[in-house]
A protein has these predicted regions:
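Short secondary-structure boundary/capping segments
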Residues: 178-182, 280-286, 335-340, 369-381, ...
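Intrinsically disordered, low-complexity acidic Ser/Thr-rich regulatory segments
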Residues: 223-264, 386-406, 594-611
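PLP-dependent aspartate aminotransferase-fold enzymes
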Residues: 2-28, 103-115, 120, 124-319, ...
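Active-site C-terminal subdomain of aminotransferase-like
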Residues: 331, 380-527, 534-541
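Conserved PLP phosphate-binding loop immediately N-terminal to the Schiff-base lysine helix
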Residues: 295-297, 321-333, 352-397
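Short Gly/Ser/Thr- and Asp/Glu-enriched loop/turn motifs at secondary-structure junctions
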Residues: 157-159, 260, 523-530, 609-611
Length: 654
């Protein structure tokens, strides 16, 4: 893709350029938003009128005065006014007073692009229904591939491929689908008896190839097939198809190949619940999801190595190892580099499997690590201007993304785009040949001769049968206005990381200020822009009492449609710390620092087997308002101190 003329290399994203990115906490950019939306809606009307202008208007000028027309307009206005009134009870994600879940204000380029595209109503299932936006979606996949370090040159055979999804859940499902198709395909080739290919010697070896080798075998098969006469080509394609897992189904496939077992998926205990849903949807079964313990908020790679060795010894196949780049609850990064290394060692011993990174939250943080030419910045280069970011483990995890097989990223999280916009990216697009579904009424026509032509029939390769082109336009335009490197989009994510460091420092000051009344700690060093805070009233030793105290604090920071929004000073969220996520040593350390007796972490299933903590997602770029000299982070801790004292006073009075 050519460099975006709107954002040249010598023009980094500055503070005042950030000011133009959003509608703003106070709606400061309302004139700009209104001007552009009206301009492009008018442009859409002109487009309609210029399509065969000789056709007479189907709606007469007199229709607007007819009683039925007026009655419909009146009813529509009434319902829209009621909708608008009801929406005033929505959570104010746009405000720097919101520090709750993974959502903030929307980037105006994406918002306007989505509004602009909606009246055209493109369906990105194919170029017949979306001749413009389907190309944009393919480009978005390449933009994201470049951001994570995958090959993004469509002229290369091993170029990456990505597409948008409704969210991270569907992207994770697509990752499972791709990994399973690739894992089982060499077995189908053996069963079909395809000649002239260097096939593995038995089903076990075929089912446990390294993904790179399985992809090369797929490419060899397609090359061999293309060289056959037309009739034989059709025969061999059908023969292999009838041996594939997708054709036979799980039961028949594993019955025919008795030495094989349904593969496991290895994931950290902090993995999103979508992995459980995905295994159920795919028919693998929830029991195949093996959740591994954490050590210091990161996947315990010793446990991973032990599990892989046990699987190899017991001849239990593994479908994939999952790393999380920015956990939903804590924002922490798993050691992607060490997980990839563990896979390489296992594959060398005959236990090949995929590595997938669930970077739904942390994916866009890679912009901070990328130069304009797509190369990786050193840790020292990235660290300039920060107090502690990035930890060596974080830089190593980002650097290793290029060595993984697939990645989930959510533009509707740290990409500041409307909900309903996730993304799946695979390292090598050739594997999508295993996903292709043919439907002549949608995908008929000549065979594709290039990367872009191939993926204009996007619906052949994705789970959805219909998908919004407006979402693709929103992401594409956003990435064009804010290229995915440290000078452009990375300046925005940098603001959030600086806010996280400021919050961490503020939490330490808060703890000193409240010493003797409440014990407060940041339980672990933040990896990203999500910071947790653990609290316990001084003198209390019971986990149940500490949990009840934090619940009462959070009650004042949660949305309540029965109350006016203005009664809320701040919005936050909460989560829990569990021994299986932290490890016993870390859990004991945290409980000890809070003055809690570990014996009261009873684990009887009534909620006191975990510690409830406050969770703060620091996405808003105006948490530190330089224009007005206001720190909403400082205001938050002032508010928190006041609420803590009120709750303690009420408890003492009782």
């Amino acid at each position: 893709m050519t460099r975006d003329a709107l954002m040249p290399a010598e023009s980094p994203l500055t503070r005042h350029r950030i000011d133009a990115c959003f509608l703003g906490p106070y709606g400061e950019n309302n004139n700009l938003l209104e001007k552009l939306v009206v301009e492009f809606l008018r442009d859409h009307v002109y487009w309609r009128r210029n399509f065969h202008p000789e056709d007479p208007p189907a709606i007469s000028t007199e229709a607007s005065r007819h009683p039925d027309y007026l009655a419909f307009e009146s009813r529509m206005r009434r319902e829209l006014h009621q909708l608008s009134a009801s929406l005033k009870k929505s959570v104010p994600f746009h405000s720097p007073r919101y520090m709750g879940h993974m959502v903030s204000d929307l980037l105006m380029p994406g918002l306007i692009a989505q509004i602009l595209t909606l009246p055209y109503n493109p369906n990105n299932v194919s170029e017949d229904s979306a001749p413009v936006t389907v190309d944009m979606e393919v480009q978005v996949g390449l933009q994201l591939a470049r951001m994570v370090g995958y090959v993004h040159d469509p002229l290369r055979a091993d170029c990456a491929f990505g597409h948008l999804t409704s969210g991270g859940t569907l992207a994770n499902y697509q990752a499972l689908r791709v990994a399973l198709a690739l894992k089982a395909f060499p077995v189908a080739l053996r069963s079909a008896g395809v000649p002239d290919l260097d096939l593995p010697e038995d089903d076990w070896s075929a089912f446990n190839l390294h993904p790179h080798k399985a992809t090369q075998l797929l490419d060899d098969w397609l090359t061999w097939l293309a060289a056959q006469p037309l009739r034989e080509r059709k025969t061999w394609r059908q023969r292999v198809q009838q041996e594939r897992l997708e054709y036979l189904g799980m039961l028949e496939f594993f019955t025919r190949h008795a030495q094989l077992r349904v593969p496991h998926v290895l994931a950290p205990v902090t993995a999103h619940y979508s992995w459980s849903k995905g295994l159920k949807l795919l028919g693998l079964g929830r029991s195949q999801l093996q959740l591994l313990p954490e050590q210091g908020m990161r996947l315990d790679t010793d446990a991973l190595e032990s599990t892989l060795e046990k699987c190899r010894r017991e001849r239990q196949p593994v479908l994939m190892s999952v790393a999380v780049l920015g956990t939903t609850e804590y924002g922490t990064f798993d050691p992607v580099d060490r997980i990839v290394a563990a896979r390489e060692r296992a594959a060398a011993l005959g236990l090949g499997h995929s590595v997938h990174v669930d970077a739904a939250w942390g994916g866009y943080l890679a912009t901070v690590f990328r130069n304009e030419d797509g190369s990786l910045r050193s840790r020292d280069e990235v660290a300039r201007g920060y107090h502690a970011f990035p930890a060596p483990e974080v830089h190593a995890a980002i650097a290793a993304l290029a060595d993984t097989d697939s990645i989930t990223i959510d533009p509707h999280k740290l990409g500041y785009l409307p909900f309903g916009t996730g993304a799946f990216i695979c390292r090598d697009h050739r594997v999508t040949a295993l996903l292709s579904e043919e439907a002549d009424y949608v995908f008929g026509g000549a065979s594709a001769t290039s990367y872009h032509e191939r993926y204009r029939g996007l619906g052949q390769f994705i789970p959805e049968g219909s998908k919004s082109g407006a979402n693709a336009a929103a992401v594409y335009v956003t990435h064009r206005v804010l290229p995915l490197d440290h000078l452009h989009f990375g300046r925005l994510t940098r603001q959030t990381l600086l806010a996280a460091e400021s919050f961490h420092a503020g939490a330490n000051r808060f703890a000193d200020k409240m010493h003797g009344r409440v014990n407060a700690i940041v339980p672990f060093q933040p990896d990203s822009n999500l910071v947790c805070l653990a609290l316990n009233p001084a003198g209390n030793t019971r986990v149940a009492n500490a949990n009840a105290f934090v619940h009462r604090l959070h009650d004042d920071m949660r949305a309540d449609p029965r109350q006016p929004l203005q009664l809320k000073q701040f919005f936050g969220s909460m989560t829990t710390l569990r021994p299986e996520a932290l490890g016993d040593t870390e859990m004991r350390r945290i409980l000890g620092q809070l003055g809690l007796d570990v014996a009261t972490l009873d684990g009887v299933g009534n909620g006191d087997d975990r510690l409830v903590i406050l969770r703060h997602t620091l996405m808003n770029p105006y948490l530190i308002d330089h224009e007005n000299g206001i720190s909403y982070i400082d205001l938050y801790f002032d508010y928190l101190a006041s609420r803590v004292q009120q709750l303690l006073a009420a408890h003492d009075a009782a």
